[in-house]
Amino acid sequence: MSFRVHVRVMPRGGLLDPQGQAVEHALAALGFAEAGGVRVGRAIELEVAAGSRPEAEARVRQMCDKLLANPVTEDYLLEVEEA
């Protein structure tokens, strides 16, 4: 079976997010002062061949832990669906 996986990687709460701060300041400078608490992350989409949804999720968690996310400074969320 093939599964489409959406991975959302975000900086851990409480850690400095320089990109988020830069975007927040730029938004304020452009007149969007109501925007606050901006955090910048990234989205990754991939297809995984696996025998089941739990197997696909486990494999992608391994990918995240080893490459796609920094486990010290980032958290990630997965959404798994049949392709």
Short names for language-model regions:
Residues M1-A83:
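Long, contiguous binding/interaction regions
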